[in-house]
Amino acid sequence: MPTYNIVVFGGDHCGPEVTAEALKVLDVIDNSNADVHFNIQPHLLGGASIDAHGEPLTDEALAAAKAADAVILGAIGGPKWGTGKVRPEQGILRLRKEMGTYGNLRPCFFASESLVKTSPLKEEVCRGVNFNIVRELTGGIYFGERTEDDGSGYAVDTEPYSRAEIERVARLAGFLALAEDPPCPVWSLDKANVMATSRLWRKTVTDVFANEFPQLKIGHHLIDSAAMLMVKNPRALNGVIVTSNLFGDIISDEASVIPGSLGLLPSASLTASPDGKSKCNGIYEPIHGSAPDISGKGIVNPVAMILSLGMMCKYSLQQPELAKKIDEAVRNVIEKGINTADIGGSAKTAEVGDAIAKELEALLK
């Protein structure tokens, strides 16, 4: 029976509320016939860590995360900690950098067909949307040299990218596309008509797929036309989307509104391709923030957090059947109408979590 070491960062505000529901799901698996055991290690991150330790991420918590099989994160940040010298966001940036989570995965899909009506897009436009955005997470403009405005009214950000960085994330996208049944197309987004780094990006991605994934379809879109296409005909992007840090940050937020609630979509940030040959640690978290306006009210949607567990089982733990069971349990509960207010229901956070745990327990018998 494999035992997996899982570090849990509840984080701030509604973060601990959703991780509490995730732990219910892990407890069900732990006590089922799945022959899987979890060693849960809770630690502080973000504002909670600042309050307790004066820093957003302690060396002890970082070491635990790096040594773990996977990391679960609720959400961090909030107005209490402002924009001062020590900020919650510094903790997650350090965590990503030190763990080396170079690939951020944000799938866009409907957890249940019944949710199509919650989308801001027309049903005939969004029905059948199913793509996975792979964002390069540790390079690009967020990590380039910068010059702050010193009062002169002038500032500079630079976007560096190396061929090796682009090759690595392109291979991750190719692996994910190849793992689908049947293999799906890959869409690379750039701004090659203007930016030198984008021209390097396009050439490198083209070379990787020609040499290493010749059986896959690879297409290229300029980021601005892709942003338009995502609203006009998002199914045209079904498959795997791969793009740079900045473009991925923006386009994944655009995609996040398609299912109708931020509380529905999971994410993963991976340290390696999940090929089963080497360790693939990852940070698994919902795409929503800490939502201080609703924290403590018991109304935050735990679905995104629980679906993130499914991604954890699929990628870091190499337990694809468990991942399918988690997704199925979530779908069944949504279709039974046990939903939080953001998707038209009246259930509380804990009620949804309890229902999913109970459904999963039945599926694992």
Curated annotation (Swiss-Prot):
GO terms for MF: 3-isopropylmalate dehydrogenase activity; magnesium ion binding; NAD binding
> Which positions does UniProt annotate for substrate binding?
96, 106, 135, 224
> Gene3D superfamilies given for it?
Isopropylmalate Dehydrogenase
Q: Does the keyword NAD apply?
A: yes
Report the cofactors: Mg(2+); Mn(2+)
Function comment: Catalyzes the oxidation of 3-carboxy-2-hydroxy-4-methylpentanoate (3-isopropylmalate) to 3-carboxy-4-methyl-2-oxopentanoate. The product decarboxylates to 4-methyl-2 oxopentanoate.
Give the family from UniProt. Answer: Belongs to the isocitrate and isopropylmalate dehydrogenases family.
The name this protein goes by in its record: 3-isopropylmalate dehydrogenase
Q: Which organism is it from?
A: Zymoseptoria tritici
